[in-house]
């Protein structure tokens, strides 16, 4: 599903030299290298932000230089040895490469900020656009950096005003929406319309409409670039060039169709026509999830309506096949921002638990033929989950959002990385599996109960890691310091932190009993917090130097924070992240 990552992976497997035993190793080398460069860009990002506190020039004093490098070192190493990032760095998956693109894009925009007033500075914006196009073929999470990039541009080019700030938010939404809901879906949509017209209408060969549309799109875009260049329309030239390179990056998805046409052994969804590719790109095999409006989990369908038409490839033309089915529900069981929506039977009990619901409020009682209530073995009244009584309230809906989606599926992972982790057993709310801990006994026992009497396989789990809140505290110090010293940059990092964290929680709208832990989805948010960990070092140095004017201060603070945060994290995480001598057989 990630074609550019697949191409990169194929390139790295060439270094196996035909030895299939080394293919897995070379794929993991790709993740390792991508992760290493991610840390490099994080180091450069932190040092860039610290340099702005002292004025962006080359003549720094020795204490300032040590502060800059020490902050970058501590912040970058803290992220290096964080639980989520370290795990993704040692597996052959897209998330290490995705982290690299996120880090590269954010750093590149800061690089543009330095030279924004120089000739040809827009080449950095075009590079970023190209990376965005490539990232579509790796993971769509990278697009969430766009609002932060828009504000870097706004703060550099325009004086701050309230209206300008609001317009920048609007521009962020428009650009992000244009890529996600115009470029990505509409290019294959229009290609499919041309394909249908050329094949069914003009009796031309298969794929002729797709080829014609792509040639036409490229030709019109190139002409627009040439025309705006001749007319010296710099802004429009940059926009069209950026659009062009986004399409070039997005074109990696053509490899998906090429592989499917070749009928490779692994050919999920068979996307060999533009119509099946369109379904593949829209992730229709995963179904729909309501975002801002939809039915609650105990709603029952009232009718079925026909949805979109799909087409099947025949011998010499495309045939219309059955349309998708769309269920409609009683409006009383629909609501705004539905978080408890999944109608799968096993999820109902979880919604009842997490949102503190009562079955008696949601369902009618089961009754026998005489109309008497049916009781279970323990004498409890049984309720018919196929006979809804009333929908949950909005407050109950939001309780699930905060307790499960925010608390269990985001904050728990955040605390894994910056406070500590109980074990690597997947948990669904149990006090003994997969919770966050701090290592401070009375705080952990207040939440989870006594931890000493647990079985050895839980108590002595390799992933039992304790950081005593030290990374979290240092990051919060850096956050506060950042807003006090340079609120504009702090706002930009906050956007990155929120959009790659809580915003993903809102968009995914996850149901309970997830098949695996999902911390990898929020690696970008943890990356942003690592920036504040680095700035926390700067905050401590500057606070102490107000009283002690000595070069020993930045050296001492760097060494102490290095030992208390990244070294502590490395020592705690090493045993459960070291993959030496781990084999499947």
Regions found by a protein language model. Name each.
Residues 29-60, 104-108, 473-480:
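Transmembrane-helix motifs of polytopic, lipid-linked glycan transferases
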Residues 55-58, 62, 66, 105-124, ...:
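Membrane-interface transmembrane helices that cradle and orient dolichyl/undecaprenyl
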Residues 113-114, 145-177, 181-239, 561-568:
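Perimembrane helix-loop-helix junctions
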Residues 1-21, 32-33, 40:
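Short hydrophobic/aromatic helix or loop-helix immediately within or flanking a transmembrane segment
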Residues 514-538:
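Hydrophobic/aromatic-rich transmembrane helices and adjacent perimembrane loops
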Residues 174, 243-247, 483-487, 531, ...:
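Signature aromatic-anchored transmembrane alpha helix within multi-pass, membrane-resident enzymes
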Residues 70-73, 115-133, 162-175:
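Short hydrophobic alpha-helices at membrane interfaces in multi-pass membrane enzymes
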Residues 14-15, 20-28, 53-68, 75-99, ...:
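Aromatic- and kink-enriched transmembrane "portal" helix at the membrane-lumen/periplasm boundary
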């Amino acid at each position: 599903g990630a074609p550019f990552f697949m191409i990169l992976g194929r390139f790295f497997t060439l270094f196996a030299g035909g030895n299939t035993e080394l293919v897995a190793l070379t794929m993991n080398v790709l993740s390792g290298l991508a992760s290493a460069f991610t840390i490099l860009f994080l180091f450069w990002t932190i040092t860039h932000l610290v340099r702005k506190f002292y004025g962006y020039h080359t003549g720094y004093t020795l204490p300032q230089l040590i502060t800059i490098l020490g902050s970058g070192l501590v912040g970058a190493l803290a992220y290096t040895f964080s639980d989520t990032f370290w795990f993704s760095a040692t597996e052959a998956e897209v998330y290490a490469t995705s982290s690299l693109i996120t880090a590269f894009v954010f750093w590149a925009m800061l690089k543009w900020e330095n030279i924004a007033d120089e000739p040809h500075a827009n080449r950095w914006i075009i590079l970023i656009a190209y990376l965005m196009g490539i990232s579509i073929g790796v993971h769509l999470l990278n697009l969430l950096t766009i609002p932060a990039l828009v504000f870097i541009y706004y703060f550099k080019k325009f004086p701050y005003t309230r209206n300008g700030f609001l317009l920048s938010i609007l521009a962020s939404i428009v650009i992000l929406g244009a890529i996600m809901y115009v470029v990505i879906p509409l290019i294959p949509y229009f290609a499919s319309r041309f394909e249908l017209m050329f094949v069914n209408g003009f009796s031309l060969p298969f794929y002729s409409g797709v080829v014609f549309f792509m040639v036409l799109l490229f030709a019109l875009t190139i002409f627009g670039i040439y025309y705006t260049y001749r007319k010296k329309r710099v802004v429009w030239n940059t926009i069209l060039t950026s659009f062009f390179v986004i399409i070039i990056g997005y074109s990696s998805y053509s490899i998906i169709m090429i592989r499917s046409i070749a009928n490779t052994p692994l050919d999920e969804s068979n996307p060999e026509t533009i119509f099946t590719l369109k379904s593949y790109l829209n992730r229709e095999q995963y179904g729909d999830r309501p975002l801002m409006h939809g039915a609650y989990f105990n709603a029952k369908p009232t009718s079925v309506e026909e949805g979109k038409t799909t087409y099947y490839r025949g011998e010499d033309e495309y045939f219309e096949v059955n349309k998708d089915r769309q269920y409609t529900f009683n409006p009383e069981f629909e609501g705004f921002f539905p978080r408890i929506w999944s109608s799968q039977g096993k999820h109902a009990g979880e919604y009842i638990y997490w949102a503190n619901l009562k079955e008696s409020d949601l369902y009618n009682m089961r009754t026998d033929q005489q109309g008497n209530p049916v009781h279970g073995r323990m004498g409890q009244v049984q309720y018919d989950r196929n006979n809804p009584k009333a929908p949950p309230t909005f407050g109950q809906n939001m309780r699930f959002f905060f307790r499960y989606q925010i608390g269990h599926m985001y904050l728990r992972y955040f605390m894994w990385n910056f406070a500590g982790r109980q074990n690597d057993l997947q948990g669904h709310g149990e006090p003994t599996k997969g919770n966050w801990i701090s290592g401070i006994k009375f705080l952990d026992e207040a939440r989870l109960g006594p931890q000493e009497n647990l079985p050895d396989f839980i108590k002595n789990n390799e992933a039992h890691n304790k950081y005593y809140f030290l990374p979290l505290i240092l990051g919060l110090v850096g956050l506060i310091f950042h807003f006090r010293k340079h609120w504009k940059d702090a706002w930009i990092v906050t956007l990155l932190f929120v959009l790659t964290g809580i915003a993903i929680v809102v968009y995914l709208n996850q149901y309970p009993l997830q098949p695996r832990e999902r911390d990898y989805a929020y690696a970008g948010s943890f990356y942003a917090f690592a920036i504040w960990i680095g700035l926390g070092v700067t905050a401590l140095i500057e606070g102490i130097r107000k009283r002690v004017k000595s070069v020993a201060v930045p050296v001492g603070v760097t060494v102490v924070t290095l030992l208390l945060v990244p070294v502590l994290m490395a020592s705690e995480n090493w045993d459960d992240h070291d993959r030496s001598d781990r084999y499947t057989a």
